[in-house]
């Protein structure tokens, strides 16, 4: 993936090209992970067709979640007012790139593919991130906290509902969950603003729709 660096000093055209390249890398590329795959030392097992289909559906949801996280963070970083906030967002995005690569690897192992709607998921998340960022960095960080808490919840659900013998997927999700919790904690420490009640509910509803579609497509 294109090196993630602050964009504040770039010209408007440079920034547009950087954002376009990030979108292409996230949606259509195969970004390499900086950290080793957590499942590397976990032996694979033979899953029956139904188990494989279910595991692939869950990992596709998790892959979409990382596509959305990239869009959200890049949208927020593009309009961040404070250099420290922008750095925090881009640093979190880099770790989410690891998650994206790990989920893509696992989908390949399961003979499956990413969601056909990834361009839509990314565009919607980028727009949401930019809108949140325009309200102020405290709002932007508030969206980070709520997003990561909701992701933690669905990772817990997936850890429970994956096929019992699919330990490779579990190894990936456990590390992802640790990272997401840390991102939320760091955003809170950086001055995140609690979001008004209707916003988390709307985010949860949108997430439910995404998961329903991504599980199959």
UniProtKB/Swiss-Prot annotation:
Pathway annotation: Cofactor biosynthesis; ubiquinone biosynthesis
Binding sites annotated in the UniProt record for Fe cation 1: 66, 96, 99, 180
Q: Which cofactors go with this protein?
A: Fe cation
* Cellular component GO terms held in the UniProt record: plasma membrane
Q: Which residues bind Fe cation 2?
A: 96, 148, 180, 183
Where does the UniProt entry say this protein principally localizes? membrane
SUPFAM superfamilies given in the database record: Ferritin-like
Q: What class of enzyme is it?
A: oxidoreductase
Task: State the reactions this protein catalyses.
Answer: a 5-methoxy-2-methyl-3-(all-trans-polyprenyl)benzene-1,4-diol + AH2 + O2 = a 3-demethylubiquinol + A + H2O
Cellular location of this protein?
Cell membrane
Instruction: Indicate what this protein is called per its UniProt record.
Output: 3-demethoxyubiquinol 3-hydroxylase
Keyword tags = Cell membrane, Iron, Membrane, Metal-binding, Monooxygenase, Oxidoreductase, Ubiquinone biosynthesis
Function as written in the Swiss-Prot or TrEMBL entry: Catalyzes the hydroxylation of 2-nonaprenyl-3-methyl-6-methoxy-1,4-benzoquinol during ubiquinone biosynthesis.
Name the protein family: Belongs to the COQ7 family.
Organism annotation: Xanthomonas euvesicatoria pv. vesicatoria (strain 85-10)
* Cofactor binding note: Binds 2 iron ions per subunit.
Q: Which GO terms describe its molecular function?
A: 3-demethoxyubiquinol 3-hydroxylase activity; metal ion binding
What EC identifiers does the entry list?
1.14.99.60
- UniProt keyword Transferase present: no
Q: Keyword Cytoplasm: yes or no? A: no
